[in-house]
Amino acid sequence: MAPTDAEIKATIKAVVDDFRGWDLAPIMHYPNEEGLEFQDIYFPSDDGVPLEGWFIPCKSSNKIIIANHPHWFNRAGIPSHLEPWNQLMPGNDFEVNFIPDYKILHDAGYNVLAYDLRNHGLSGSGNQGLFGFFEWRDVLGSLKYIRGREDTKDMMIGLFSRCAGANATLSAMRHRPEAFKGVRCMIAPQPISAGSSIAVMLDKMGAPASYMEEADRQLFMKTSFHISQLSPPTDAKHANVPTFLYQVRDDPCTTPKDVQSVYDNIPIEDKKLKWIEGTDKRWDGYTYFQREPDQFLEWFAKYMN
């Protein structure tokens, strides 16, 4: 049975409302659970929003990885084995814990800065709680913090930019390309376009594609932005560091074409795209680093040694 107009519009509204508010996930895990020393740190975003994070030192190392996170998550991951986060994405009702990622990086010889994006974790709120359009300023703030801190200012920098964090990093490269001078490389799991995810949602519920106009109208009225303004493939044209993308191929939230377009639009030769096969769980893309880290450590080592 086809959905009614009212049902389609209500579903669109629920998606659009998430751009202005969601259930904040608590920080469930800390680096000391993996035997890692760490400092609680804070620094301003480029526009002044206070950001909270961890600095995880690796003694005698002159290399640092700056890590951010997907939407709904924070620097520690997400407790999606618990209510209400187990309802975010059907089939992804298992916890994602990012602390093992930081342990792998530390043991491979990297300092780590992991921070919460604005409106997530313990970081401050900005832009009336708006998601998706200003996190690029947080990326710039993290770079300024590392370059301004006495014990990290001369370190080689690599980026671990996950999902919304990848979107934000690509957007920052468009807005402030000069800020990435000297950044050695990036790994970027699962960037995602608003247009792709909304189109897939409409298709799965059997709604005509013409409802994209209604989705765009609702998004604009809620956020002052259009769907086309949240487009990693467009921002990828400004990517200026070696970039390793990876993505669950059968992710039901998007299409392979979206991430393929991000890859295709990166204008430099030093790029790579890895498809994760055998699963349709988006969250498996976020735990893939800790399951199969060697290829990513090789990428970092190639550009940071």
Task: Give residue spans per PLM region.
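N-terminal targeting or regulatory segments adjacent to alpha/beta-hydrolase or S9 domains
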Residues: 1-34
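N-terminal cap/lid segment of alpha/beta-hydrolase-fold proteins
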Residues: 22-64
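Short, surface-exposed "cap/lid" segments of acyl-processing enzymes
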Residues: 58-108, 112-113
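Alpha/beta-hydrolase active-site loop
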Residues: 97-107, 117, 128-150
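Hydrolase active-site cap/lid region
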Residues: 171-225
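Short beta-strand/loop motif that positions the catalytic acidic residue
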Residues: 238-240, 245-247, 251
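Short alpha-helix in the alpha/beta-hydrolase fold that links the catalytic acid
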Residues: 241, 255-264
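C-terminal catalytic histidine-bearing segment of alpha/beta-hydrolase fold enzymes
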Residues: 260, 264-305
